[in-house]
Design a protein with these regions (language model features):
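Short beta-strand-loop/turn "lid" adjacent to the catalytic site in phosphate-handling enzymes
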Residues: 1-16, 42-46, 77-98, 121-124
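Short, conserved acidic/polar surface loops in the N-terminal third of protein domains
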Residues: 2-6, 26-28, 184
Length: 390
């Protein structure tokens, strides 16, 4: 988030890893059902609601100077064109937004004693919000007067890029973390899912998150001083289920990690030291990432017959995609374009300058499915049995 004073100068800027709001989150915990009904999110110190409340309580001098609260992407647009604007899918992650009705929640803000006059206007993804100013042109090299188009949140832009725009469709963005989402045309609240706005009006998302799946893969790669191609080759030589070896590396269901499970690799007993090679570690983390995706599909009440559309760095691996199809027991559809979130944002930009009438038309014209992975019956049956024990 970025906060501006009345002169348009930044007085606070930090990503979601700023957890000073945790103390305020403790205060908010008694209001969690009310807060989640409005915002679609559980109480957490990383969201804007708790951070604003923390500043009001512990640093009132800064809080009193706030003129505008922005998400980081809103702030970048402000620097380019001077407009103070947010977008529903972006604002959804602030826990300050009425996700059902698409507006900042005065009801919620008043209930916790926060100001209601410090939030930007709301525009839809693909709408022009201004043009590049002379100052921004000098600093960036962009041409003065270039249209600035309202963007969308990264996962939602990925869904647009994959043309996942119908109620019931499923998608996973397998990057640093892996959000797992079901599109719905009505506002739903569920104990085990987040509810966010899609990048297209009239649609919402039921979202889980499998945790730091991409970081887990990178950590294992760096730990063994290897690369992803070698990891895959060695993992392929290991049987399904890794001879009983299991990996727990920050995986989550709907963004909530088990408080009783420590991270690491678990071996069956008795443990025969020579039985496990590097490939076991590699396959174990790939499989664990896929198990977490499946658990989140179940948490968001995914239809068992619906295919799973996927994008993100992890989906560059045929090996990963194949395991994912087997573990989830459903068709996995990849994309021809590797940078699918960038493609989704380009669709919004082209819509904003009039090349397409709306986001749906742009997605229909510009999105192309890649390779499709079918679950293998014998592997699917093995994982069904293994997951009962896992």
């Amino acid at each position: 988030m970025v906060w501006l004073d009345r002169f348009g100068k930044e007085i606070y800027a930090a990503p979601s890893v700023d957890l000073r709001g945790e103390e305020a989150a403790d205060i908010l915990s008694g209001k969690e059902p009310f807060i989640k009904e409005i915002t679609g999110l559980p109480v957490s110190g990383m969201f804007g609601l708790a951070r604003l409340l923390w500043y009001k309580k512990f640093n009132e001098a800064v809080y009193d100077r706030i003129d505008t609260v922005m998400m980081i992407s809103d702030w970048i647009c402000y620097l380019l064109c001077g407009s103070k604007v947010s977008e529903p899918s972006v604002a959804s992650s602030s826990q300050l937004f009425d996700v059902k009705n698409g507006k900042w929640s005065s009801e919620l803000l008043k209930s916790v004693g926060l100001r209601t006059d410090i939030f930007p206007e709301i525009s839809d993804f693909g709408e022009q919000i201004g043009t590049v100013t002379k100052e921004a042109a000098c600093e960036t090299g962009l041409k003065e007067g270039t249209p600035v188009i309202c963007g969308a949140a990264d996962s939602q832009a990925g869904l647009v890029g994959m043309n996942v725009l119908k109620s019931g469709m499923l998608a996973a963005v397998a990057g640093t973390t892996t959000p797992v989402m079901r599109v719905t045309d009505r506002y739903e609240i569920d104990e085990f899912a987040f509810t966010n706005r899609h990048g297209v009006p009239g649609l919402w998302l039921q979202e889980g998150n499998a945790g730091i799946t991409g970081l887990a893969l990178r950590w294992v790669r760096d730990l063994f001083r290897t690369d992803y191609e070698i990891m895959t080759q060695e993992a392929m030589s290991v049987p399904l289920g890794c001879d009983g070896m299991r990996c727990f590396s920050g995986h989550e269901i709907a963004g909530r990690r088990s408080s009783t499970c420590r991270s690491g690799f678990v071996f069956p007993t008795p443990w025969v030291l020579d039985s496990y090679k590097r490939g076991h570690f590699f396959r174990a983390v790939y499989e664990a990432n896929c198990y977490a995706v499946r658990a989140n599909l179940e948490a968001i009440k995914a239809d068992s017959e619906s295919p799973l559309y996927v994008c993100g760095g992890q989906t560059a691996s045929d090996f990963y995609n194949g395991i994912l199809a087997d573990v989830c027991g459903r068709q996995v559809i990849t994309q021809k374009e590797r940078e699918i979130t960038g493609l989704g944002i380009a669709m919004g930009a082209f819509t904003g300058v009039g090349l397409y009438k709306d986001i749906r038309e742009a997605a229909a014209e510009m999105s192309f499915a890649g390779k499709i992975y079918e679950p293998k019956h014998d592997c699917q049956a093995f994982y069904e049995d293994w997951l009962e024990k896992y």
